[in-house]
Amino acid sequence: VFLQAGLSKLLDPDWSAGGFLGGLPEANPFIELFTWFAGNTAVIDPLVIYGQVLIGLALILGVFFRFTALAGALQMLLFWLASFEGGITQGLPVEHGYLVNDVLVYALLLFGLGALGAGRLYGLDRKLEEHSLVEKYPWLKYLLG
């Protein structure tokens, strides 16, 4: 999901987060945050594009899985907060559901996979944990899968 989304944005010269962020309902309780994002697309666009590409690659390879899963979940949570159509105060449902939509499901799955350390099963994190650098700096294990 992340890799495909990031690559499609990267290959589209007209893509900008400003288009999405500028069209949010005014009643969204987080409108000030997303209005700030919309005014800073020179920073936000590369963060979204390259973030999605790197998150996608890292999840596929199983490298720095916990950190990557957390980063992906946080990005999904921001997308979820932006998805309130009319805002919570203006009523529900949000698109595709009452409160839970596909974006929230992705975020919860990523939090769960990161908490379980899924990168250790078949990912590169299994090999990275055996590296002498990780033995020297044990805190690195918290970033690995």
Where are the predicted features?
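Substrate-binding/active-site groove segments that recognize
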Residues: E26
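Extended, low-polarity transmembrane helix blocks
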Residues: V1-G23, I31-L54, L61-G145
